[in-house]
Regions:
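Short, low-complexity disordered leader/linker segments with a strong preference
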Residues: 1-67
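Stable alpha-helical elements in mature extracytoplasmic
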Residues: 77, 91, 116, 131-134, ...
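Short, glycine-/small- and polar/acidic-enriched structural segments
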Residues: 64-214, 230-236, 253-256
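Short, surface-exposed acidic
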Residues: 101-105, 203-209, 306-319, 350-357
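Pocket-lining segment of extracytoplasmic ligand-binding domains
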Residues: 142, 166, 201, 206-209, ...
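Secondary-structure end/capping motifs
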Residues: 272-350
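N-terminal hydrophobic or amphipathic helices and topogenic motifs
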Residues: 39, 43-51, 59-109, 337-362
Length: 362
């Protein structure tokens, strides 16, 4: 998976430049010799012209091609990205077919939202599938100048999973316990802190009466299995893995909250708005296709996860996780406002937040 794309000169263009440079270099002082036969000279000239023509075509093709860089996570909550990236690998690119032959899609994988939003701000990617809270954080931090939500993607699929031995059976049991989340400031991190605060616990970003530990999803699973975590607030497929591999049980499930949105950078919207518009339309079609073809969508999502994580998920695990999600491009009324309120309650956002520019239709 790409992490730092850069343009490279087409091999044919390199060859042409070297050949033309050699042909154009000043001749060395030599003894007088008979000139080459006219036929030989014409043959070399034809070769040079042909190579130059090939190089010119390569340069034009490269100059005309537009690349859209799209970020996502290795989570089932990002099923549209998993399915589309797998179709790209299989030579059946969903977005490529709908955006045209002059558009290339490059996929980039992140562990959680804050990292993806750093990439948006750095102009390293153009669009991303991400949770609402990291998008909100960047929107507020940049005073609305960096990111826009252009579509919904998924609801649900997030939960608090606790050890199955009964140590956490009610909110009062959480004092002094350790709960992991995917990344500081991410959607599940904010949800965990906000919920714990509502239960009366003192929670800070670095300490508190309950330890909230930002930890990458793969590490969460191994630490949970080793009994070094009391609970994990995360998303599918990790919720199901914690249940099935870690023998955990769901304490609290978020069934209807916004889990994933599709965002675009303000820079991409300014420079290539029509292309972003086509991408969003294709995303809508893909969401509908996933809902109509769940078995094929699950197969492709699992194939993509195998490429990214180097390990395929058991089909029964995917089957267990899938029904917990609703794939939709709609944003439920009040969903973003609720996310803002949670982030404000735990200090990630402060003051009055103007959301009037956050959501846009390209």
């Amino acid at each position: 998976m790409n992490t730092n794309p850069k343009s490279t000169l087409p091999p044919r263009a390199d060859f042409a430049r070297n050949l033309i440079a050699k042909a154009s270099a000043p001749a060395k002082q030599m003894r007088s010799v008979a000139p080459p036969a006219r036929g030989f000279t014409m043959k070399v000239s034809r070769i040079l012209l042909a190579v130059a023509a090939v190089a010119s075509c390569a340069f034009r093709a490269q100059a005309q091609q537009t690349t859209l860089r799209v970020g996502h996570f290795p989570n089932i909550t990002h099923a549209q990205a998993l399915v589309a990236s797998q179709l790209s690998r299989e030579g059946k690119g969903w977005f490529e077919q709908r955006l045209g032959p002059d558009v290339k899609i490059e996929w980039f994988v992140y562990n959680a939202g804050p990292s993806a939003m750093e990439a948006i701000a750095a102009n390293s990617i153009d669009l991303a599938y991400v949770g609402p809270n990291p998008a909100l954080n960047l929107y507020v931090k940049a005073e609305g100048e960096e990111v826009r939500i252009v579509s919904g993607a998924a609801l649900g699929g997030a939960a608090l999973v606790v050890q199955g031995d009964g140590r956490l059976s009610k909110p009062a049991d959480f004092k002094g316990r350790a709960i992991a989340t995917p990344q500081l400031g991410g959607t599940q991190d904010v949800a965990a802190r906000a919920w714990l605060k509502k239960q009366g616990y003192r929670i800070t970003q670095l300490s508190g009466e309950v330890m909230v530990l930002p930890t990458p999803n793969p590490d969460q699973l191994s630490l949970f299995i080793d009994n070094k975590l009391d609970g994990v607030w995360t998303v599918e497929p990790w919720v199901s893995r914690l249940e099935m591999e870690g023998k955990g049980k769901i304490f609290l499930e978020q069934k209807d909250v916004i889990t994933t949105v599709l965002v675009a950078s303000v820079k991409a919207l300014g420079a290539r708005r029509e292309l972003v518009k086509k991408f969003v339309a294709a995303h809508l079609e893909l969401t509908e296709w996933i809902n109509k073809n769940p078995d094929e969508a699950k197969r492709m999502a699992n194939a993509a996860l195998k490429v990214i994580t180097k390990k395929a998920m058991p089909p029964e695990l995917i089957d267990h996780a899938w029904p917990r999600l609703t794939f939709t491009t709609e944003l439920p009324k009040g969903g973003l406002e609720a996310a803002v309120a949670e982030a404000q309650s735990v200090g990630f956002l402060r003051g009055k937040i103007d959301l009037s520019r956050l959501v846009t239709s390209p």
